[in-house]
A protein has these predicted regions:
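Composition- and surface-driven signal marking solvent-exposed, interaction-prone regions
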Residues: 19-26, 86-87, 95-101, 111-113
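Carbohydrate-binding surface patches
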Residues: 66-106
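Flexible loop/turn segments at secondary-structure boundaries
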Residues: 11-16, 91-94, 119-122, 156
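Aromatic/acidic polysaccharide-binding cleft in carbohydrate-active enzymes
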Residues: 1-71
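Acidic, Ser/Thr/Pro-rich beta/coil linker or hinge segments at domain junctions
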Residues: 103-143
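Hydrophobic, well-ordered secondary-structure elements that form the walls
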Residues: 5, 40, 84, 98, ...
């Protein structure tokens, strides 16, 4: 289990770098987080502390497709939230059926955050919204994307 990550170099002044990628660029007037920064931020804010068994069925069962789709479902021990993370490394969207064991005590409206764009895109930013979820729900993973679906625990 990975609890921390280290990214080097973290900061780099534009025009004064030895290699690419760096995590955050800056110049004399602005700070420019990279796409990698946002991906690390999304993982860090949604790490979870307990793995939850789940299954995902794809509309395409080819091995080449399955190897490029990543899924993780965890629970945040502090908040009780369930966190579904989906990665699509393919250049096309993929339809998935997500099956969770139980949503008992959870809201059916979740917060979805998506980071999507071509691998060469440098201006991609996470986009958040809401979506309805159930114990079994369909979701279209955009091409080249990382999606976090955070299902909040019901407040009593």
């Amino acid at each position: 289990v990975v609890t921390m990550t280290s990214y080097a170099p973290l900061l780099a002044k534009e025009g004064h770098t030895q290699w690419n990628p760096d995590l955050i660029y800056f110049n004399n007037t602005e700070v420019k987080p990279t796409v990698g920064y946002y991906a690390q931020q999304m993982y860090g804010q949604n790490a979870g502390s307990e793995y939850i068994a789940s299954s995902v069925t794809l509309d395409n069962a080819q091995d080449a497709v399955k190897k490029r789709i990543g899924v993780s479902v965890v629970r945040d021990g502090k908040t009780g939230d369930m966190i579904v993370k989906l990665v699509n490394l393919l250049p096309v969207a993929v339809n998935a059926q997500v099956e969770l064991l139980s949503l008992e005590g959870m809201n059916t409206t979740a917060v979805k955050t998506v980071l999507a764009g071509k691998p060469t895109d440098q201006q991609v930013r996470p986009v958040s919204g809401t979506m309805e979820v159930s114990e079994k729900f369909g979701y279209e993973l955009p091409a080249y994307s990382f999606t976090v679906i955070r299902i909040n625990k019901n407040e009593k």
